[in-house]
Amino acid sequence: MHPSVRRAAAATALGLAVLGSSPSLVWAAITAPASVVVDRYLAATGGAAALTSERTLYTRARVNGFGFDGRFESWSARPDRHYSRTTLGPFSLAEGSDGQSAWRTDPTTSKVVPLHDNDLLDARVSTWFELERWAEPDQGGGDVALEGSERDSLGDYKVLRVASPFTGVKPRRLWFDERTGLLMRVVAPRDAQSVITELSDWRLALGRMRAFTSLTRVAEMPMNRLTAVTDSIAINPSVEGLPFRPPTDAPADGMKWLKQAGVAQLPLEYRSRHLWLKVSLDGGPSEDFLFDTGASVTVLDSGFAARHGIATSGRMQAAGAGASGSATFASIGAIAIRGDDGDGVEFANLKVAVMNVAPSFSAYFWRNLAGVIGYDVISRFVCTIDYDAGTLTLHDPKTYHYAGREAPLPMVMNGTVPGLRGRLDGRYEGVFRLDVGSSSTVDLHTPFVREHRLGGKLRHALPVSGAGFGGKFESTMGRLKRMDIGPYGWNDPIVLLSSATEGAFASEEFAGNIGNRLLERFRLTLDYEHRQVFLEPSKRYRERDVLTRTGMMLGWYGDHVNALSVLPGSPAAKAGLREGELVSAVDGKPILEWDGRALERHLEDGPDGRSFTLTVERDGAPRVLRVRLKEML
C-alpha cells in the first residue's frame, strides 16, 4: 500500500464536490501506549528499516468513483515531496508539493492553481501522512497519542490520534486492527466534514506489507465514494524532473476573447440582489445565468439540460448553503458570455456540473434560470463588478493593472471562494467568503455563531428561510452593532445566523459569507491570480441596511404566484397573508402582468405607512388584503 492512494481519493472526492508558506511547527511526542501500537504496525509491515529505506515510491492504481473509471499515479520522495495525476472519466487532476509550495489543477479546466492559506497547509499535511512520517523514530515532528479502542462489525481497533507538525490543523484518527496490527481506517477532518479511507487487501510487496485496495468516502455524503486498486509499485525510482513545483508549461485553457484581447466589458443585470449574465451554449440563444463567486464550478440546470438534449454522466453529492444535493456532469462544446455589441469571452469544451437548481431559484427570482457561472470560469480573470453601472469587466491577469485609488486587501483562498478578514462588533474576527451569489449582508456560519454566542447578541431577531443548491434552509436574522473590513465599516449591519449542520454554512474555515447587500456599496475587483481585492466605495456606501418592509416573499411558478414566506409579526402577516396562499393581483393589476423588477420596487419602495393591496384566493373566493410598509429591523 502507498498512502498516496488515500490522498488522491480524498482530493478527487473533495475537488469535484468542489496558512502561509511556512506554518510553525509543534514539538514531536509520542505516548507510551501509542508507541506500542506504532511499533506493532512497523513489525507487521516489515520493520522500521523497510519503511525508512523507501526514499522514493511510485504507485499506480485503477480508480472508480462518481460513476467513472480512471487511473491514478503517484510519486513521493522523503521528506516532503509529492506529485500525482488522476484521470476519472472526462476529468483530469494533477497536484504537487515540494515541501514549501504546492499546486493542483482545476479538474474541469486543467488550469494550474498555486495553493495558499489553508489549501497549502492541507497539501503539506497530506504529504506528511502519505509518507507515514508519524511512524519514524521522531514521529516526523508530529504528535501521536492513543485515543482509545473502537469496535465495529469487522473487528476491534486501537485508535491513534495523530497530529502533524503543522499548527492549525486538526489531527487525524488512525484505526489499527488489534488482531493483525495493520492500519485499517483513516479519518481525516476536512472543514466541517470528515474524509474516511478504508484500507484492505494487505499483501507483501517489495519488502513491506501494503494495502492494495482503498475505499474513500466523504462522511454524510454517500454518493461521494472512490475506490482505488493498486496494480503497480516501485521503490526508490528516480523522481528527477517531476513537477513537484508548479509547472510553467500549462496547457491552453480553450478560452478566447470575442472583441478585444485582454479585456471584455459585459452588461450585468443586478436584480433581486443577484448578478445576471446572458450566456449562450453551443451557439444557441442567450440564456439567464447567475454570476456566483460562491459556486465552486459552473452549473447547468438539470431541467434545462434535459430539454436541450445535453447528455450527462457520472454522479456526486454537492454541498449547498445549508444542505447538500445531487449532481451529474456534462461537457459543453462552446459557452459564450457576451453582450449585444459582441464583446465577451468564449470557452471550448467546458465541463460543468448539472444540478436541479431552477425549481428553487426561479421561484425566488421571477425568471427561468438556466445555470450558474462559477469559480472555474471566474478565477481565470480579474473581475470588476460595477453594481451602479451594471457592468462586469473581465481582465487578463497577465496584463491587468489597477488604476484606482484604493489600497488592495489581501484575498484569502481556502478552496474556491475568495475571502477577506473582517470584524463584527469590534471583537469577533474571522475570514468571510465574498459570495456574490448571496443577497445578504453577512451570513454567519454555525460554528462561528456558536463560538461567540451571537444568538444572544442579536437585536430584533427574526426567523427566516433561504434557498441554496441543496434546497431550503432556515436562519435567524437580526442586527449587530458594527462590521469592519479593512478601512471600511458600517453600523447596525443586518446578519443571518445559521444553524445548518451540513453544507457551506456549517463551514469552520470561514466565519461567514459576505453577500451583495454589503458588496453593492462598492465597485468590486477580484484578482484571483495575485490574491487581491479592491473595494471602491460607490453611491450606496453609506446607506443603512434595510430589510424587506413587507415581510413577505412571493414565488413565481410560471402560471401562478404563491406567498413563499411570511415573517411572523410582519406587515404582510398583520394584513392576514398566509404562507402558500395563491396571490392573484397587486393593487388590482393581475399578478402575472407585473414585471418582477417593477413589482419588487412597488412592494418595497416608499416611506413607512405607504400601502398597497394584495388579492389572494382563499376558500375558493378572492380576498383583498391591505399591506402597509414598515421597517422591521
List PLM regions with ranges.
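Bacterial N-terminal signal peptides
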Residues: A11-S24
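N-terminal mature ectodomain segment of secretory-pathway/periplasmic proteins
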Residues: A29-I30, V36-S110, A145-G148
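A short, surface-exposed beta-strand/turn
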Residues: S74-R85, E95-D98, K170-R185, V229-L242
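Short, surface-exposed coil-to-beta transition loops
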Residues: F68-F72, G89-S92, T167-R172, S194-E198, ...
